[in-house]
Every structure is written in structure tokens, then in C-alpha cells.
């Protein structure tokens, strides 16, 4: 697949599942995120989102409006972003950056009461930290322990 011109975000649907299940993630990335096939069973308040490049799934993440959000912010209008991944075969094409740049307008249209997105990124995951900073997320100064070490809590105001 050539580098796509049109990037959009959409709610995961049944038609996306076969491609999402085949995503390839190298071991050095799997330690920091979950494979999309591990997120097939979502609970109320979790919204699986697909990054589409010219209509083809290339990325995935989950937006949460669950009690879990309170672990990261006291803002009752915030959402939590987790498990961002880009299929390894589609990496280095700008899809993560462009998908995250589309996040604000997607949330404003689909979740109009949301005014903040928070996330936690492992302190060793420098590429992800740089991505989030490039698209406008800021380090809140809060720290938490994750499964493999310290995580930085970042946010973006919408």
C-alpha cells in the first residue's frame, strides 16, 4: 500500500476485524501497547477507534469514558486514550501522527461534551512521547506505575 492521502478516524466495525486481527507489531512495541485482537471484547464506555488510510485500517486505539479515566484526571469531561498501535507494515508513513491530529475534530463531533484527552506513555517509549508532543499533548507532570515501569500522564485540551 502506498502512502495514503486521506486519513480518517471511525468506530471499529465488523468489516475492520479481519485486517485488525492481522496487524503485525514487533516485540519492542508490543511491550508498550496491546494488539488490536486483544481488544475485541470491550465494555460499556470503551470506544474502539480505527485509523483509516484511504478506507483501509492502518491503526487502532481505544477511547474510554469509564471509571478508569479518574486514575488520570479529575476532569469529569475527559476521555482516556489507550492501546494506540499502527500495523508494522504501515509504519513510518505518518499515519499515527495524522490519526492523532484528526483526534480533536473526531471527538468534538462524536463526543461533544469531552474537553480533554489523557493518556499514559511509558517513560522508555520515547517514539510515542515524541509523537504525542508533536500533535499537541503535554506532560502533566503526573506519574504512575504501569505494568513495565513508570508512565508519564499527558493530556490535550480540546
Per-range role (PLM):
Residues 2-7, 11-83, 87-89, 101, ...:
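Acetyl-CoA-dependent GNAT
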Residues 64, 118-120, 140:
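Solvent-exposed beta-strand sheet faces enriched in polar/charged residues
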Residues 87-89, 93, 123-124:
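Active-site acidic-Proline motif in GNAT/NAT acetyltransferases
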Residues 92-100:
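Glycine-rich acyl-CoA binding loop
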Residues 97, 123-141:
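Conserved active-site alpha-helix within GNAT-family acetyltransferase domains
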